[in-house]
Curated annotation (Swiss-Prot):
Name listed for the protein in its UniProt record: Large ribosomal subunit protein uL2
Disordered as annotated region, ranges: 34-58, 225-279
Residues that span the membrane, as ranges: none
Compositionally biased region (Basic residues): 269-279
Disulfide bonds, paired cysteine numbers: none
Known partners and oligomeric status: Part of the 50S ribosomal subunit. Forms a bridge to the 30S subunit in the 70S ribosome.
RNA-binding keyword on record: yes
Domain of life: Bacteria
Length: 279
């Protein structure tokens, strides 16, 4: 993938860029793998906004991506097409299995049309193949990692993401995550070889607010510029800093939202670096 930059012929195009989609081989998705996708506008079942900054955006259809490839062990599949998916940053690959089935998977870097991929404990160590971590050599870069055996891929699924298998001790494999965290995962869990493709996606400059609206992202308005009726930080004469610790619109403290006593925290060997520890 490469990034195409626009000439500054208008204010919205100044500095903006777009993916060149050179790796895409087909523009129409596989119809049997499509499902309707209904927008919520950030509202819950009572109609109240539970997630701000959501709404609008282009109409989409959901592509059924196979994050659980256990049922196709030992069945080779040919990469028929690399396709665009509006619901994620990564590209997706359409596989035609030898038994006639068709499935989508996340397209790893360097996977191209015509390649043959396979799942199962005896699969080769090459991009796109899916194996249990007990069968993957230490030091291998992987993605689409399960957290529970048979639970489907949960980690390292966005564009350019990857995890490194750094050690294996007993029934656990140690993984180095993109955040720097080192975590134990059951060796029976599966992962796909290679890193997710479309890594240059993070370098795209969207250029104008309108392109974000196409994606369904609404403006983010700071609380300190609102009125007191709208936000606890609102009001004051002139520009003010809010005068209190950051809170949301309901007055609940912002930041540090992760649970400190999550059951799976015992599997963390080394925590990710945060704040001043990032240096």
């Amino acid at each position: 993938m490469a990034i195409r930059k626009y000439k500054p012929t208008t204010p919205g195009l100044r500095g903006s860029s777009v993916a060149d989609f050179a790796e895409i081989t087909r523009s129409t998705p596989e119809k049997s793998l499509l499902r309707p996708l209904h927008k919520t506008g950030g509202r819950n079942n009572t109609g109240r906004i539970t997630t701000r900054h959501k709404g609008g955006g282009h109409k989409r259809q959901y592509r059924l991506v196979d994050f659980r490839r256990h049922d196709k062990d030992g069945v080779p599949a040919t990469v028929a097409h690399i396709e665009y998916d509006p619901n994620r940053t990564a590209r997706i690959a359409l596989l035609h299995y030898a038994d006639g089935a068709k499935r989508y998977i996340l397209a790893p870097a360097k996977l191209k049309q015509g390649d043959v991929v396979e799942a199962g404990p005896n699969a080769d160590i090459k991009p796109g193949n899916n194996l249990p971590m007990r069968n993957i050599p230490v030091g291998t870069t992987i993605h689409a990692v399960e957290l529970r055996p048979g639970g489907g891929a949960k980690m390292a699924r966005s564009a350019g993401a990857s995890v490194q298998l750094v050690a294996r001790e007993g029934k656990y494999a140690q993984l180095r995550l993109p955040s720097g965290e080192i975590r134990n995962v059951d060796v029976r869990c599966r992962a796909t070889i290679g890193e997710v493709g479309n890594a240059e996606q993070s370098n795209i400059n969207w250029g104008k607010a309108g392109r974000m609206r196409w994606k369904g992202v609404r403006p983010t308005v700071r609380g300190v510029v609102m009125n007191p009726v709208d936000h606890p930080h609102g009001g004051g004469e002139g520009k003010t800093s809010g005068g209190r610790h950051p809170v949301n619109r309901n007055g609940k403290p912002e930041g540090r939202t992760r649970r400190p006593n999550k059951e799976s925290d015992k599997l963390i060997v080394r925590r990710r670096r945060t704040g001043k520890n990032k240096r």
